[in-house]
Amino acid sequence: MQRTGKSRRALVRHQTWAVALDAAKVRFEDGWHEVKTGAVFWVEAATGKQGVGEQGQAGRIQAREQSYIAEVGSMEEAGARLYAEVIERGVDPAEQVLVCLADGAPGIWSQYALHFPHRVEVLDWYHAMEHLWAAGNGVLGESTEPAKQWVAAQEQLLWDGHVEEVIANLATLAEAPKGEAAREQIHYFDVNRERMRYPQLRAKGYPIGSGLVESACKRVVGARLKQAGMCWTKTGAQSVLALRTARLSNRWQQAWLATAALPLAA
């Protein structure tokens, strides 16, 4: 049954909506540049026990009705395009809370702050773990048993919401020989600590992993623009990405109807 605009808006207001933004490198005529890729989706909670980490949460938080954007221009242009996609989905950022996922890049947080006043910022769990592994492996040895044990302990602390204890443990590890690898990670966890309150986020049914947009970088950008020998102009890449995102967002027919409605050149 087709929903009316009014009933659709009412449904959207009661759903938990999220956005994620990331980037993938593509070869252009003047070298390699980032193509920013974003995803807009709502999340559905299911019952079931969680394990530790993003994979443990996957059993109870699932992304639904994903749509995508891609931008070869600046981060500011990507932010504007993501905002337009949120509006297209019927979400009003001026009224509705949006869960905003990112890997910690300052430019992404800035765009979220600009466009989504009622946001909940979430640092992607997988990237947080990558930074813990960088510290553990760098100080205690690549994939050694001490490194594995140290990272496992920090993972449990982070999962349970003790980010300040993780920062303190990084500071302790930084005093060891080769401690620079841990020292480099302290700032990352410090500036993102409020985005890493994972127990509270999970309790509200919010996603903590940006795996969807990581996958989007491969599906939207990589699978189409990074085949062997490909080299793009920015205009050509943006045109192809417009078609690619329309298809993957289930708006292919809509995109062609809009094109057909354009006036013919004289």
What positions do the PLM features span?
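Catalytic center-proximal scaffold of phosphoryl-transfer enzymes
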Residues: M1-A266
